[in-house]
Amino acid sequence: MTSWLIGTGIMLIHLMGMISAVMALMSSRTSQGAVAWIMSLLTFPYVALPAYWLFGRPRFYGYVTARGARDNVLRRVLRRYRNNMKPHISLPATPDIQAVEQLAMMPLTKGNHAELLIDGQATFEHLFRGIDEACDYLLLQFFIIRDDRLGKELKARLVAAARRGVRIYFLYDELGSRKLRDSYFKELEREGVEVSPFGSSRGFKHRFQLNFRNHRKIMVVDGKKGWVGGFNVGIEYLGEHPRHGPWRDTHLALKGPGVLGLQEAFWEDWHWATGEVISLNWHAENHAQMDHQVVIVPSGPADKHDTASLLIQQLIHSANDRLWVTSPYFVPDQGVQDALRLAAMRGVDVRVMIPERPDHLLVFLSAFSFLPDMLRAGIKIYRYLPGFLHQKVMLIDDEAATVGTVNLDNRSFRLNFEITTYVPSASFAADVEAMLLEDFSRCRRVSIDEINSRPLWKKVVSRAAYLTAPIQ
């Protein structure tokens, strides 16, 4: 009897492995990912089955379902909002901008003011001032929140805003902020702040969808001012963590119609997390005196396309003279790697700035496996020396730049909900150029000899680490 049960169990495990392999074949977004999962599920189903159901599913089906329901619940609000936006929409001047609009499913807006916020002190002073000036409502969304000195100051500012009658909606990622105690939010809730986790495993049906995260960092005040970028809430983002030292990051402060794009992304996330449709201001404010054009590009695992990866590839292909990129994690998919190499081969000044110090060791090691190909193609790789580099910024020629939350890795491309602000404006690009030139002055350039001279065991470890790139 016991042997029959064991045999039946083994047969069922292998059958489930075969069924899951077919699912991986039909749903994986890359051929490399499909091959890796199929081989693992058929050969080692005892280990691969739980890994696949926890980490291997490429789309966030719960969010997809919620988007379908939105057709009945939210479409009327979106229609009114888009009608209000018509006077503030610019016709795309080039096919490149048109492609970004198509990926974003949001329009290019005019009459915006985009301002760079460099490093933590300037960013949080700006954010806290925005909280203090809020009159009607506040929308806040972060990946990581800590109950340290900075987190306590944020909480105090929110409590003060709530007491003067401001409606506050606070969304956080339940995995990114898993170390935060419940008492932090309970105090806010007692003051009337509405708080919700963004959890991809919400509900019995979606209990295995643990690998999707909401990596967006957004704040919107009254539908008139918005902030987006790389900063989470914790003292390490002020450069006060002994392990990381000085923290180099970039945020963006935005005024104008583009703010409503940030608001729409938050609004949709809030609806997924809570089921609520919150009442917000959808009337755009135009700042014609500082006419930056802006497209807000949300991306995530519920999209029909790999929006983040396609956006990066489009921006690379649009560069004619210069493409400067900064990212804390640099393990791009094959499409982005090929686009970067081709850009360098056609004479574009391609520079990639990455940290000298590792934050996530597996991701750090993975990069060594393909850096030689990058360097041989003419791409210049720089490592930022003082502290940890966390900014996600791109500069395209003298004409456009992006600031957002997307890292150049598979997690940002396919597993995380992210957001990018694309600003096709020469004056804004000049500001980004000045900022990055200062950063490059604090970097060292990586040589191909440095990579090739690494011991064999380190090369083997890097190649092995790279195999895990689809789920890093």
State the predicted function of each range.
Residues 191, 349, 353-360, 367-368, ...:
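Cytochrome P450 I-helix active-site segment
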Residues 325-327, 384, 403-404:
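Thr-Gly-centered strand-to-loop micro-motif
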Residues 329-351, 355-360:
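Helical hairpin unit composed of two closely spaced alpha helices linked by a short loop
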Residues 392:
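Catalytic-core elements of nucleic-acid end-processing and repair enzymes
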Residues 322:
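Phosphate-/nucleic-acid-contacting segments
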Residues 1-310, 314, 318, 358, ...:
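N-terminal localization/anchoring segments of enzymes in phospholipid and broader phosphate metabolism
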Residues 334-337, 364-366, 395-396, 414:
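Histidine/acidic-residue-rich catalytic or RNA/ligand-binding cores of hydrolases
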